[in-house]
């Protein structure tokens, strides 16, 4: 699918949000600057708006590795694993520990090999025009057919 504007990307985030539940996992894959954090920002800000809360700034957690957002009954864990080089480093982050009743949004998920029940992989690529992006979806569990629902 070709995304022609930020408004279009925002509409896609709204469709993802309609299906999003606690414990879901979103993997964002793409080059630096392609829009992974922008999509995350839209998801978080739209959820805040939906819950009647003011919108917060959503930054890339490249240096912190993780930013957490408490949005009413939702907890969102936004990870950026760009600087992680070995799988053993992932264990220290505890991304998939069972006690985490949270949505996990993971940028640069390449090292994650844990099988997950409900996961949506979102692939972002630069389009032919400067402001275009190509986006594709690969889902597991309840996300399996999301590509056809959008």
Predicted regions and their residues:
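Short phosphate-coordinating micro-motif centered on Lys-Gly-acidic
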Residues: 88-90, 96-150
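Conserved nucleotide-sensing/catalytic segment adjacent to the nucleotide-binding pocket
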Residues: 62, 66-108
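P-loop (Walker A) phosphate-binding loop of NTP-binding proteins
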Residues: 31
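Hydrophobic anchor at the beta1->P-loop junction of P-loop NTPases
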Residues: 26-28
């Amino acid at each position: 699918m070709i995304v022609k504007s930020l408004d279009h990307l925002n509409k896609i985030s709204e469709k993802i949000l309609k299906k999003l539940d606690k414990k879901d996992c979103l993997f964002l894959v793409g080059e630096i600057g392609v829009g992974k954090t922008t999509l995350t920002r839209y998801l978080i800000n739209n959820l805040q708006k939906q819950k009647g809360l003011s919108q917060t700034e959503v930054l890339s957690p490249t240096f912190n590795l993780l930013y957490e957002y408490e949005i009413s009954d939702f907890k969102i864990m936004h990870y950026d694993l760009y600087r992680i080089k070995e799988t053993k480093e992932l264990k220290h982050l505890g991304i998939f520990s069972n006690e985490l009743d949270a949505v996990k949004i993971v940028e640069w998920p390449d090292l994650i090999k844990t099988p997950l029940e409900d996961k949506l992989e979102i692939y972002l690529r630069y389009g032919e025009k400067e402001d275009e992006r190509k986006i594709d979806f690969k889902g597991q569990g309840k996300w399996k057919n999301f590509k056809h629902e959008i």
